[in-house]
Amino acid sequence: MEEKYNRNRIYIKPDEQEKIKHFRVLLGGAGIGSIIAECALRMGFETITIIDGDKVEESNLNRQNYRLEDIGNYKAESLAKRLLSINPRANIRVINEFVTHDNVEKLIERHDIAINALDFKSDIPFVFDKICSEKNITVLHPYNFGWAGFLAVVDPDGKPLQGLSGKPLGFELKVAEYVLGYQAFWMQPQEWLEKVVKQYQREDVTLPPPQLSVASWITAGLCTHAMFNIATGKDVKKFPKFYLSSLLL
């Protein structure tokens, strides 16, 4: 095992370390994806494609993997620069484009797993999942619930996340409502999240959901662990089941 991964020993076998090194990760969206990318890289995922046409804004700095000096620069480029400063030998591919109907199929090709961290401003996140399913690619859906990290793993042959709502506007809220209903059914109500959802529902529907750095890092850990399990043939929970992690649970 390479020296930089020496502390992974016991948890990760040498052959598993080699597998994840070449496991091709597609990162659709470099918001919460920016935290996931670094967590994955540090564990040994060295083949990552970053797709995002957005640029860094000051409001991103409370929860995303950027610095003041990155403001105004492309997120994908800034993130790649940071990742390569950690591991210069990593295979980091940068695409400074938004995912569209015209390019989505080409972008998804030749990857082993996809992270759908795209903004729900159009139906593109749904199209992204559909094409991944057609290409037999598992999709990870990470969400930032402030004090809690959420991850849904969508199997190519399983139930699509789009089943929660066919409308992109307010989709994050639908996911939160689904979590609340699921937890209540299993006698694990999340009153803190209910309060957040009710307050957010009173805001302008066009406002993005509030998010904290806490959940960004929790979710990054969930995603990286799930990718490791998938890459090495271990089990993961598939949607409609999900992962939810917080001190408040």
Can you describe what each PLM-predicted range is?
Residues 1-26, 58:
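N-terminal charged helix/coil linker that caps or initiates catalytic domains
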Residues 113-214, 248:
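E1/E1-like adenylate-forming module used to activate ubiquitin-like modifiers
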